[in-house]
Amino acid sequence: MTKELFLEIGTEEIPAGFLPKAMAEMEGLIRKELDNARIAFGEVKAMATPRRLALVVSQVAGQQADAEITAMGPAKKVAFNEDGTPTRAGEGFARGQGVEPSALSIVVTEKGEYVAVTKKETGVPTVGLLGEILPRLINNISFKKSMRWGDLDVRFARPVHWIVALFDGIVVPFSFGNIESGTMSRGHRFMANTSFPVRDFTHYLDECERHFVIPDPAKRKEIIRREIHRVAKAAGGRLLPDEGLLEQVTYLVEYPSAVHGTFSAEFLVVPREVLITSMREHQRYFSLVDDNGKLLPGFITINNTLTEDPSVVVKGNERVLRARLSDARFFFDEDKKVPLENRVESLKSVLYQAKLGTSYEKMERFRALAEGVAEELQPGLKEKVSQAATLCKADLVTGMVGEFPEVQGIMGREYAFLQGIDPGVANAIAEHYLPTQAGGELPASDIGAFVSIADKLDTICGCFSVGLIPTGSADPYALRRAALGIINIIVAKGYALQLTTLVSKALARLEGKLTRKKEEVFGDVMDFFQGRFVNLMTDRFPADVVDAVVAVSFDDLVDTAAKIEALAVFKKRPDFEPLAVAFKRVCNIVKGPVVVVGVNELDFEEDAEGTLHRAYHSVAGTVAAKVAERDYLAALTQIATLKGAVDDFFDNVMVMAEDERVRNNRLALLQEIKGLFRDIADFAKITA
């Protein structure tokens, strides 16, 4: 008979950012614990509010499954004498396992023969095991920061005040710190600050809502979404979509309600991004726009309580926002007094990184790289690229960015517009930070893209040069994001750039800063880029296709991506599997790089040799032309016509003939075949 397991951990307010990860961990931990304990179970679901983490598991078996347990003992030669009688070691092992020596069995392992005992272990009632599992689960939930409280020897995100632990409606007894598990939960801190008993999960949800708590974040999110759209419409505007803020406020409240507030229209002279950022980042307010997308002087905030007179709450919110926007207006007015060009020199006093110098030094390095990219791809843009690179970090020393770091680049663009700087240059100042996240918006202009590539490349090469290499989950300089940004820009824009050349130029600019050998840094950076590229491509294409292409070419990212896409399409052909098998045989016999050796038709001894040689010459020219045009699908289609001749060759020809001259000629023939696809993919890596 299956039963329901329910756990609630009641706490002081946990930071919103901690909760989604904690929920995922709870689900993973309980699955692992129940699996390890041989306890069958059904659906697992975690929930969270700022003051509670809850977990429900359905269809939990009432009893642990039986199992056969094998205990390994000493080696056979240690456990038994030559005459088969047990030694003292054998007797001791048997005694420790509670069996007679005659019950010992022999198990053959990689290390030799060992004695063992196989015993049937009868499952015990689940409830007894849960008393150990649940406190261990609570203790194993990890947080970015945890704390101790009182003189207790436990840690959690915030002090724990109550624990509900039920199995089939019965308390699972255990303690965590000084808290004993029980049946009593608590309501909303301000609207229903009382305890209430819980019978099961359904009863828990009902009682929570009666006590002004909505435990399920998905339900809270939909309530908030519905409410903010309703309030926005009532206020005569539309909500500016912000899924990130919606996710955040979902975990800030237990019982959400939305209210509308306003601010003075005089603040609309401040760039909209600053207003939006101030409301979102500092106050957690949603912004409002009109039907044309123009920012309105209003906001929506989510309260954690219902109030009889919302105006009191609104006035408080408006007062706080007015102070923030007044600061923004002051910084904006002051910053406009100093041209961006005049601020560049101040970057010499801004430390970028202790071993890599100032922000001014960094700017000089990536400006040269950006100019080089422009020279190679669009020489006519070089002057504007140089200007954009020079100015793109200047807003770091403005008052506005000092107060609102999130608007770096954006303010540089706005000040550039106000100062009459070329619009392309102004936009590039903001664009050079893009993309700011995986799958994020890319620079729209080539000027912005060139500067973005250069800045990110200098960051990566600089950090690798001084040993600041990402490890595990630690990536303080966001180098993985920077590498993916470069890759996405180059591939999306179709830029014909050689990655090896870019990295070499970036490292050359870092002379005098390197604390490692340049050759080692170069190799590490290229491996780093390749890893990110492979990860990115395997999200869209089969892993074996990506590996096969990257194995033969990686320097030109656009070209490599085109080959991967072509091979992925080619692999979907119904005849691909036997085709791949045939070409894998070629690759496996002719290993290593293709060596051009002439094929002598006079040394052919079998008809299949001549047939394959003629087939090769019939397509070689077309394949070469299609490869030159980067029409790799057409090239592969031509190569595929050789399958019959290749199969006939392997069926009728012994490649490794005893006669060295004949053998080498046959190998040379296979080298020709391999040479057709050597620059597209290594078919040996294809999973046929």
Curated annotation (Swiss-Prot):
InterPro entries: DALR_anticod-bd, Gly-tRNA-synth_bsu, Gly-tRNA-synth_heterodimer. GO terms for molecular function: arginine-tRNA ligase activity; ATP binding; glycine-tRNA ligase activity. Its EC number is 6.1.1.14. Pfam families: DALR_1, tRNA_synt_2f. It is an enzyme of class 6 (ligase). It is found in: Cytoplasm. It catalyses: tRNA(Gly) + glycine + ATP = glycyl-tRNA(Gly) + AMP + diphosphate. GO terms for cellular component: cytosol. SUPFAM superfamilies: HD-domain/PDEase-like (SSF109604). Keywords: Aminoacyl-tRNA synthetase, ATP-binding, Cytoplasm, Ligase, Nucleotide-binding, Protein biosynthesis. GO terms for biological process: arginyl-tRNA aminoacylation; glycyl-tRNA aminoacylation. Belongs to the class-II aminoacyl-tRNA synthetase family. Tetramer of two alpha and two beta subunits. This is Glycine--tRNA ligase beta subunit.
